[in-house]
From Swiss-Prot:
EC number from the UniProt entry: 4.1.2.13
Catalytic residues identified in the record: Y146, K177
Name recorded for this polypeptide: Fructose-bisphosphate aldolase class 1
Reaction equations catalysed: beta-D-fructose 1,6-bisphosphate = D-glyceraldehyde 3-phosphate + dihydroxyacetone phosphate
CDD domains in alphabetical order: DhnA
Domain of life: Archaea
Provenance organism: Thermoproteus tenax (strain ATCC 35583 / DSM 2078 / JCM 9277 / NBRC 100435 / Kra 1)
């Protein structure tokens, strides 16, 4: 069996860094997320955007993959999800199996956990089963590690983000998606405690300005992260492709914000 972190890097970080275009928001937040840029409601638009910007992959839920995935960009199939209609303790359970992900052409699978929730045990237990299946089918497992509920007051506090990273490592992630602390120095500690597991920053809600998000990305790279898994901060923008290409210059080209970018 190949090292699945190495396999993830070969597929999703061919140039040494990674940009993944996340698009699991339809179930997580609903169609309201598509209103800023109505084109983004069309999964074919998302595939073109990822392909034309030269991104390393996309994240889809199973229904989108079944109807739209064309193999033009590597796929991370998200195995679980929740809605904003639910108002209880944070929990997200599987709606797709690793075996089904393989049949849909996925190159990796993703799963969200909410450490701190009253249901963390349920998600940890399910993640263990998914990890066994991912090893069986030779698919890297990307863990979205978002402490939430319980004692968690500030989800981006440095100690919480670092804990999230360590939990993902301990539970067998081959790559992880965690939130940014807002500062490269504190985020570098999260990257360190993630050990050998590559770190992707969660893009989060669209920032007020494009430069605000580019500054976040620059800080994340300075901290030693592999890259970003971003959705709304790209496809909610009216000129999404232009901004996506600016991100590519920053992440892949090693440009700094002090230099001219394609924005």
């Amino acid at each position: 069996m190949a090292n699945l972190t190495e396999k993830f890097l070969r597929i999703f970080a061919r140039r040494g860094k990674s940009i993944i275009l996340a698009y699991d928001h339809g179930i997580e937040h609903g169609p309201a997320d598509f209103m800023d840029n109505p084109d983004s409601a069309d999964p074919e638009y998302i595939l073109r955007l990822a392909r034309d910007a030269g991104f390393d992959g996309v994240v889809f839920q199973r229904g989108i993959a079944e109807k739209y995935y064309d193999g033009s960009v590597p796929l991370i199939l998200k195995l679980n999800g929740k809605t904003t209609l639910y108002n209880g303790e944070p929990v997200s359970v599987a709606n797709c199996s690793v075996e089904e992900a393989v049949s849909l052409g996925a190159s990796a699978v993703g799963y969200t956990i909410y450490p701190g929730s009253g249901f963390e045990w349920k998600m940890f237990e399910e993640l263990a089963r998914i990890k066994r299946d991912a090893v069986k089918f030779d698919l890297p497992l990307v863990v979205w590690s978002y402490p939430r509920g319980g004692k968690v007051v500030n989800e981006t506090a440095p100690e919480i983000v670092a804990y999230a990273a360590r939990i993902a490592l301990e539970l067998g992630a081959d790559a992880m998606k965690i939130k940014y602390t807002g500062d490269p120095k504190t985020f570098s500690w999260a990257v360190k405690v993630a050990g050998k597991v590559p770190v992707l920053m969660s893009g989060g809600p669209k920032t007020k300005t494009e430069e605000d998000f580019l500054k976040q990305v620059e800080g994340v790279l300075e901290a030693g992260a592999l890259g970003i898994a971003v959705g709304r901060n790209v496809w909610q923008r009216r000129d999404a492709l232009k901004f996506a290409r600016a991100l590519a210059e920053l992440v892949y080209g090693g440009k700094k914000l002090a230099e001219p970018l394609n924005v």
